[in-house]
Amino acid sequence: MENIKNPKNADDCSDSISKNSHQGVDDSLNQSRSYVCSFCIRGFSNAQALGGHMNIHRRDRAKLRQKLMEDNKDDVVAESDASEVVSLDLNEQQQQQGEALTCDDHDQYVDNDISPKQKLEFWVQESKLDTNDHGKVTEASIDGSSSSHHRDIEVLDLELRLGQSVVKKKTT
């Protein structure tokens, strides 16, 4: 920095001080990090200031998140309504498409020869676990097949113990 001795007038003094202060700011900007709010793109000189500023946007983010969840919920409902179809008759769909193509486009050749009835079935692989009176777990498949597996149900010991662990075995 320059030392200013006896300036000729006050304007010269203020000009040199502002130049020196801008040089200091420029040097510090090159060395310090800039923190930017991702919500409103406002810049901050330190992380603490940005953190305090982000608290302002907490409600805005909550409203935005809620709106996105509602939009996604509507999409999921629409997809689940469409996915309830268990089987699809391909012959009927092909006939409808063939008729639509022949009506709309007379110049294009459409093959109306449809193979014997085709059916596409969707399989669901889900199972339910039932517990019988003897403490065994039986797996019952939803599709009607009867495959059962017997497993012993272990009782979980959730007691909190301090010190060395001691394992007690129950005799049955």
From Swiss-Prot:
Query: Compositional bias (Polar residues) spans?
Result: 15-28
Q: What is its main location?
A: nucleus
Q: Could you tell me one molecular function GO term of this UniProt entry?
A: zinc ion binding
What UniProt keywords are attached to this protein's entry? Activator, DNA-binding, Metal-binding, Nucleus, Transcription, Transcription regulation, Zinc, Zinc-finger
Which stretches are zinc fingers (C2H2-type)? 35-57
List the ranges annotated as motif EAR-like (transcriptional repression): 156-160
Which tissues show it? Preferentially expressed in roots and flowers. Slightly expressed in leaves and stems.
Q: What is known of its domains?
A: Contains a slightly degenerated ERF-associated amphiphilic repression (EAR) motif, which may be involved in the activity of transcriptional repression.
Descriptive protein name? Transcriptional regulator TAC1
